[in-house]
């Protein structure tokens, strides 16, 4: 009695000998196969053997173990002629090894997200690597920590601080892109000196001066400072408290906006105002953060001893800092709003009131 065909595995390695299909056509057909377990990743490689025959090698990674009882299930069909291509089907003991083999000639195409495998057929099972691979594939920091707590308890206890910090970086969500409710053209009473500063300094990196000039804008609340500053392009917005973590601060921004921060307590005063490059910020509970820098900063403030940068720099103890600041920043005082109220919607006041700019 013939032996029944059955493979139960999470990773499948398929080889199609003498297969004339393109890798794109093969991938398209494999993606359409209906399985009870989701396909997380497919890699298709085309290889020419020494005799000139084309072969296809395929790695398929499923979300969970998939049981295949039909040895014709993975057959491919030629779209141009009545030809079927039947593969050799194996369970991949190490998807890492198979993936390396499939990629060796560089002629491949893939779909989905490759799942990390801690095992290697050459090195045997590595339980610690398996645990970390499973954690990386989990999709979130909390799930990853739970996996490591269960499967790598020693590391969980002794290295929790490092694990937590590293997983924050690995699973950090993409920064939300701020969309201004107003176009910069909505601000129709912007002084010429502000317009000129923007034209020279708020530009993409290739057009930006090596050491751009920052600007300090002082004025009463509800003059449109914040909304105008945030309408100019991709920026980092720091209000009240400076958070330079990757969750908030982007090294790809065109400029910074520092809003309503008392200059007496502004950390990295010179780094921001001087558009300095490649500097570090020490965090209280984490590793130092590397800031690429080289971008200008817009400082927004109200008049008064705890807000005004002019008043702060006029203090006798800050005379040398003032001399430096005058070479690195433009100082502008607003006496009128940057907009004509007839052109602004009702959100202007509410936003300005929130930021107290």
Curated annotation (Swiss-Prot):
A divalent metal cation binds at residues 47, 55, 57, 105. One of its GO terms (biological process) is DNA replication. A motif (RCR-2) lies at residues 55-57. ATP binds at residues 219-226. Its EC number is 2.7.7.-, 3.1.21.-. One of its GO terms (molecular function) is metal ion binding. The active site is at residue 101. A motif (RCR-3) lies at residues 101-104. PROSITE patterns: CRESS_DNA_REP. Residues 6-114 form the CRESS-DNA virus Rep endonuclease domain. It holds the Pfam family Gemini_AL1_M. InterPro entries: CRESS_DNA_REP, Gemini_AL1_CLV, Gemini_AL1_REP, Gemini_AL1_REP_central. One of its GO terms (cellular component) is host cell nucleus. The keyword Transcription regulation does not apply. SUPFAM superfamilies: Origin of replication-binding domain, RBD-like (SSF55464). Residues 154-174 are annotated as: Oligomerization. Essential for the replication of viral ssDNA. The closed circular ssDNA genome is first converted to a superhelical dsDNA. Rep binds a specific region at the genome origin of replication. It introduces an endonucleolytic nick within the conserved sequence 5'-TAATATTAC-3' in the intergenic region of the genome present in all geminiviruses, thereby initiating the rolling circle replication (RCR). Following cleavage, binds covalently to the 5'-phosphate of DNA as a tyrosyl ester. The cleavage gives rise to a free 3'-OH that serves as a primer for the cellular DNA polymerase. Homooligomer. Interacts with the replication enhancer protein (REn). Interacts with host retinoblastoma-related protein 1 (RBR1), and may thereby induce the transcription of host replicative enzymes even if the cell is not dividing anymore. Interacts with host PCNA. Interacts with host SCE1 protein. There are 3 rolling circle replication (RCR) motifs. RCR-2 is probably involved in metal coordination. RCR-3 is required for phosphodiester bond cleavage for initiation of RCR. This is Replication-associated protein.
């Amino acid at each position: 009695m013939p032996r029944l065909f059955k493979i139960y595995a999470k990773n499948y390695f398929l080889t199609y000998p003498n297969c004339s299909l393109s890798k794109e056509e093969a991938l398209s057909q494999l993606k359409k196969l209906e399985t009870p377990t989701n396909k997380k990743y497919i890699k298709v490689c085309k290889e020419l053997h020494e005799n000139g025959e084309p072969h296809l090698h395929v790695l398929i990674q499923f979300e969970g173990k998939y049981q295949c009882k039909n040895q014709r299930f993975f057959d491919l069909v030629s779209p141009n002629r009545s030809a079927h291509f039947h593969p050799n089907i194996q369970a991949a003991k190490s998807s890492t090894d198979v993936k390396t083999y499939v990629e060796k000639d560089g002629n491949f195409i893939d779909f989905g997200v490759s799942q990390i495998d801690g095992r290697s057929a050459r090195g045997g099972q590595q339980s610690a690597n398996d645990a970390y691979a499973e954690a990386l594939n989990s999709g979130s920091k909390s799930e990853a920590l739970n996996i490591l707590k269960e499967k790598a308890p020693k590391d969980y206890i002794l290295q929790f601080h490092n694990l937590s910090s590293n997983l924050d970086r690995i699973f950090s969500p993409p920064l939300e892109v701020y969309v201004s409710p107003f176009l910069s053209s909505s601000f129709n009473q912007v002084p010429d000196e502000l317009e000129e500063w923007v034209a020279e300094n708020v530009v993409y990196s290739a057009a930006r001066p090596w050491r751009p000039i920052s600007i300090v804008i002082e004025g009463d609340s509800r003059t449109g400072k914040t909304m105008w500053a945030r309408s100019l392009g991709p920026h980092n917005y720091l209000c009240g408290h400076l958070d330079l973590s990757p969750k908030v601060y982007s090294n790809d921004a065109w400029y910074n906006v520092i809003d309503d921060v008392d200059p007496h307590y502004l950390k990295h005063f010179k780094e921001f105002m001087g558009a300095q490059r490649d500097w570090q910020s020490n965090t209280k509970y984490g590793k130092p953060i590397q800031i690429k820098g080289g971008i200008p900063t817009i400082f927004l403030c109200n008049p008064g001893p705890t807000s005004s940068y002019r008043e702060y720099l006029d203090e006798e103890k800050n005379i040398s800092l003032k001399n430096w600041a005058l070479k690195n920043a433009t100082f502008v005082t607003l006496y009128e709003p940057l907009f004509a109220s007839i052109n602004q919607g009702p959100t202007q006041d509410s936003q300005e009131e929130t930021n107290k700019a």
